[in-house]
């Protein structure tokens, strides 16, 4: 029985990245032996165990043979005669197929260390094409390590395209699609996840609403980048620079979905995209099972971003109507991420990335003024029933007028 540290922990240590989780592979053992040593069984599809003290995962070395469709269509063999090299061979990328012995020796049969030096994401073997999830995983790693200079090997991109053409991606569950997408949101360059899926053809299958944006023009006066898909990638990048919050980053990526269904006869104008986008976001979130907090923020950004961009032109009562729809009186924490998404939208335009966005400060000032008007003051003044609501609105409008010097 031999135990090796494998996968992400070895890779990240070689990249001088803090190691958060450790995974281990056990060669030459059985489930019975692991159980007798106090390890707890947790794997349903293949033998995985939790260490009795550290609770880290220990998996028996295994091979996998394609026996069906999708990422679950595999038959596993995890007997004591499976070698470490055979276990590493089934892994997706060479940088994830390096093991470390307890004496520190690195076992690297597929040249993962060289690919780390070369900053290359490369498949281990042609068996890569047997698992459709790997297309999304490689896209996520491309996003995660983009800031370090990693790119996808040409041969690996070709295999990703083969996987897409095979139809296997249609067997991915909503949960796995969202899991990879959500993980990509935490990277420094989440836009690379989307652009990689676009390049290999997977975006049209797993996220068709986003794919539909590419090739759709916008007015060059406001969008020098013209293409709605390119704009979306730029907004995703700007959102990542502005906020670490994942729902904010998600909302920025999907805020313009309505542009993908604008009739060609109306191009490059998209006057109704804030309304048509609502339905598309709901459909996307239902299908991919996006959490409600992500969904709710995305819907608010989609509905209101065009009006927020027009902050300098808005009447005081329009500010109050928007605040009412956002329900920021009860949920004031909503306003900041909505405005950050709008700022990212504004900055996500070719050559205009550093242009100031005073609309954000104007909305913040309007809300600060309006929320100073308290219900108890209106009630104390003798108003009752519907009168309270009407007077509250009236006072809030006046407060915004005074603060923003609106005539």
Curated annotation (Swiss-Prot):
Protein residues bound to CTP = 8, 11, 91, 137, 140
Q: Which family does it belong to?
A: Belongs to the tRNA nucleotidyltransferase/poly(A) polymerase family. Bacterial CCA-adding enzyme type 1 subfamily.
Q: What does this protein do?
A: Catalyzes the addition and repair of the essential 3'-terminal CCA sequence in tRNAs without using a nucleic acid template. Adds these three nucleotides in the order of C, C, and A to the tRNA nucleotide-73, using CTP and ATP as substrates and producing inorganic pyrophosphate. tRNA 3'-terminal CCA addition is required both for tRNA processing and repair. Also involved in tRNA surveillance by mediating tandem CCA addition to generate a CCACCA at the 3' terminus of unstable tRNAs. While stable tRNAs receive only 3'-terminal CCA, unstable tRNAs are marked with CCACCA and rapidly degraded.
Binding-site residues, Mg(2+): 21, 23
Q: What is this protein called?
A: Multifunctional CCA protein
User: What does the record's free text say on domains?
Assistant: Comprises two domains: an N-terminal domain containing the nucleotidyltransferase activity and a C-terminal HD domain associated with both phosphodiesterase and phosphatase activities.
Kindly indicate whether the keyword Transmembrane helix belongs to this entry: no
What are the HD domain coordinates in residue numbering? 228-329
Which SUPFAM superfamilies does this chain map to? Nucleotidyltransferase, Poly A polymerase C-terminal region-like
Q: Which residues bind ATP?
A: 8, 11, 91, 137, 140
Molecular function via GO:
ATP binding; CCA tRNA nucleotidyltransferase activity; cyclic-nucleotide phosphodiesterase activity; magnesium ion binding; phosphatase activity; tRNA binding
Reactions catalysed, semicolon-separated, are: a tRNA precursor + 2 CTP + ATP = a tRNA with a 3' CCA end + 3 diphosphate; a tRNA with a 3' CCA end + 2 CTP + ATP = a tRNA with a 3' CCACCA end + 3 diphosphate
Q: Check the record and name the InterPro entries matching this protein.
A: CCA_bact (IPR012006), HD/PDEase_dom (IPR003607), HD_domain (IPR006674), NT_sf (IPR043519), PolA_pol_head_dom (IPR002646), PolyA_RNA-bd (IPR032828), tRNA_CCA-adding_enzyme (IPR050124)
Q: What's the EC number here?
A: 2.7.7.72, 3.1.3.-, 3.1.4.-
User: What keywords is this UniProt entry annotated with?
Assistant: ATP-binding, Hydrolase, Magnesium, Metal-binding, Multifunctional enzyme, Nickel, Nucleotide-binding, Nucleotidyltransferase, RNA repair, RNA-binding, Transferase, tRNA processing
């Amino acid at each position: 029985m031999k135990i090796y540290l494998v996968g992400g922990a070895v890779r990240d240590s070689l990249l001088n990245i803090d190691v958060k989780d450790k995974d281990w592979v056990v060669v030459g053992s059985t489930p019975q032996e692991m159980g007798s040593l106090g390890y707890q069984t947790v794997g349903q599809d293949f033998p995985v165990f939790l260490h009795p003290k550290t609770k880290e995962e220990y998996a028996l070395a295994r091979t996998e043979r394609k026996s069906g469709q999708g990422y679950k269509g595999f038959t596993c063999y995890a007997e004591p005669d499976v070698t470490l090299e055979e276990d590493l061979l089934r892994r997706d990328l060479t940088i994830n197929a390096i093991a470390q012995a307890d004496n520190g020796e690195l076992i690297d049969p597929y040249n993962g260390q060289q690919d780390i030096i070369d900053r290359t994401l490369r498949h281990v073997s042609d068996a890569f094409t047997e698992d459709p999830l790997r297309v999304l995983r490689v896209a996520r790693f491309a996003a995660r390590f983009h800031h370090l200079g990693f790119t996808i090997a040409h041969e690996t991109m070709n295999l990703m395209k083969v996987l897409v053409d095979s139809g296997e991606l249609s067997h991915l569950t909503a949960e796995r699609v969202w899991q990879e997408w959500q993980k990509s949101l935490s990277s420094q360059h989440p836009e690379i996840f989307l652009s990689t899926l676009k390049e290999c053809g997977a975006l049209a299958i797993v996220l068709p609403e986003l794919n539909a944006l590419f090739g759709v023009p916008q007015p060059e006066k406001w969008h020098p980048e013209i293409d709605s898909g390119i704009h979306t990638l730029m907004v995703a990048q700007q959102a990542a620079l502005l906020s670490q919050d994942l729902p904010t980053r998600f909302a920025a990526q999907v805020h313009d979905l309505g542009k993908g269904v604008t009739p060609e006869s109306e191009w490059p104008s998209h006057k109704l995209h804030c309304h048509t986008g609502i339905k598309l976001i709901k459909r996307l979130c239902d299908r991919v099972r996006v959490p409600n907090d992500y969904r709710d923020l995305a819907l608010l950004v989609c509905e209101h971003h065009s009006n927020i961009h027009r902050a300098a032109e808005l009447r005081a009562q329009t500010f109050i109507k928007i605040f009412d729809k956002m329900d920021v009186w009860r949920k004031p924490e909503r306003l900041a991420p909505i405005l950050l998404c709008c700022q990212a939208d504004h900055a996500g335009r070719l050559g205009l990335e550093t242009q100031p966005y005073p609309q954000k400060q104007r909305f913040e000032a309007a809300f600060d003024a309006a929320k100073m008007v308290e219900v108890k003051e209106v009630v104390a003044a003798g108003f009752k029933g519907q009168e309270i609501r009407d007077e509250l609105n009236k006072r809030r409008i006046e407060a915004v007028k005074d603060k923003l010097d609106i005539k």
